């Protein structure tokens, strides 16, 4: 399971011109599900994201987590995080989970994050979405539950 995490002042996701998810101070998570992912990947990544100390404390040092600041979370599915561009000019998505499995694991990930009693908003799985955000910092991180990078 892969995630691009962006610390944001605000973010929203729209489908067909309608806002389906919107947050203020918190994290935008673009989430990709791989073909070998399972519940352990969900547990690892949810815990890691919720507890990452990437928000400024009173001294301006990144020392606080999403929980510490009572931040919000916007989770958007993005299978293209498994795009392999090493051969040719068209990405291969053979490492992505099939849509039915990916949707199930995506929903389980969202529920795992909701267990932390934070505001959690989402995009619409499989839809063509427009994501808008104000990146704070900017702070952008890449995570992989298999620790590939």
Swiss-Prot record:
Classification via Pfam families: Tyr_Deacylase
Name a GO CC annotation attached to this entry.
cytoplasm
Question: What's in the keyword line of the UniProt record?
Answer: Cytoplasm, Hydrolase, RNA-binding, tRNA-binding
EC main group: hydrolase
Say yes or no: keyword Flavoprotein present.
no
MF terms from GO for this chain are: D-tyrosyl-tRNA(Tyr) deacylase activity; Gly-tRNA(Ala) deacylase activity; Ser(Gly)-tRNA(Ala) hydrolase activity; tRNA binding
Which CDD domains does the annotation name?
A: Dtyr_deacylase
Catalytic function, reaction form: glycyl-tRNA(Ala) + H2O = tRNA(Ala) + glycine + H(+); a D-aminoacyl-tRNA + H2O = a tRNA + a D-alpha-amino acid + H(+)
EC code: 3.1.1.96
Give the family, as the similarity comment puts it. Belongs to the DTD family.
Q: What is known of its domains?
A: A Gly-cisPro motif from one monomer fits into the active site of the other monomer to allow specific chiral rejection of L-amino acids.
The subunit field of the Swiss-Prot or TrEMBL record says: Homodimer.
PANTHER family with a match to the protein in the record: D-AMINOACYL-TRNA DEACYLASE 1 (PTHR10472:SF5), D-TYROSYL-TRNA TYR DEACYLASE (PTHR10472)
Q: What does this protein do?
A: An aminoacyl-tRNA editing enzyme that deacylates mischarged D-aminoacyl-tRNAs. Also deacylates mischarged glycyl-tRNA(Ala), protecting cells against glycine mischarging by AlaRS. Acts via tRNA-based rather than protein-based catalysis; rejects L-amino acids rather than detecting D-amino acids in the active site. By recycling D-aminoacyl-tRNA to D-amino acids and free tRNA molecules, this enzyme counteracts the toxicity associated with the formation of D-aminoacyl-tRNA entities in vivo and helps enforce protein L-homochirality.
Question: Any idea what this protein is called?
Answer: D-aminoacyl-tRNA deacylase
Q: What is the lineage of its organism?
A: Bacteria, Thermotogati, Thermotogota, Thermotogae, Thermotogales
Q: Which gene encodes it?
A: dtd
